[in-house]
Amino acid sequence: METIARYRYIRSSAQKIRLVANMIRKKEVVKAINILNYVNKKAALLVKKTLESAIANAEHNFGLNIDKLRVVKIFVDCGPSIKRVMPRAKGRSDRIVKRTSHLTIVVSD
């Protein structure tokens, strides 16, 4: 039985989150949480939070055993970008793009 957890509109770029997501793809959830505990990145906390949500969904909604769960799919998509303008010298301006992303984790036994 597949269980899905999504974390949407994360204020971090998809590229940064994919670095962490690739570490736990196709791993058992217990091992994946151990890996995320020792990764020193902001994205690791975001991925861990979403993974724990997927585990809780599997346990509560379907009564699945945590020890048998694996991360079947994990993917990060780009979300909408927030665009800002930064004034520069001589009347010019630069564009600041604040990127967001959507994280989806699917666990199954």
UniProtKB/Swiss-Prot annotation:
Read off the HAMAP family from this record.
Ribosomal_uL22_B (MF_01331_B)
SUPFAM superfamilies named in the record: Ribosomal protein L22 (SSF54843)
Keyword Cytoplasm listed? The answer is: no
NCBIfam families documented for this protein: rplV_bact
Q: Which Pfam families match?
A: Ribosomal_L22
Concerning PANTHER family, the annotation shows: CHLOROPLAST 50S RIBOSOMAL PROTEIN L22-RELATED, LARGE RIBOSOMAL SUBUNIT PROTEIN UL22M
Protein's organism: Blochmanniella floridana
Q: Name one GO cellular component term.
A: cytosolic large ribosomal subunit
Q: Keyword RNA-binding: yes or no?
A: yes
Could you list this entry's UniProt keywords, alphabetically sorted: Ribonucleoprotein, Ribosomal protein, RNA-binding, rRNA-binding
Quote the protein name from its UniProt record: Large ribosomal subunit protein uL22
> Which GO biological-process labels does this protein carry?
translation
Q: Name one GO molecular function term.
A: rRNA binding
Task: Outline the subunit composition.
Answer: Part of the 50S ribosomal subunit.
Say what the protein does: This protein binds specifically to 23S rRNA; its binding is stimulated by other ribosomal proteins, e.g. L4, L17, and L20. It is important during the early stages of 50S assembly. It makes multiple contacts with different domains of the 23S rRNA in the assembled 50S subunit and ribosome.
Similarity field? Belongs to the universal ribosomal protein uL22 family.
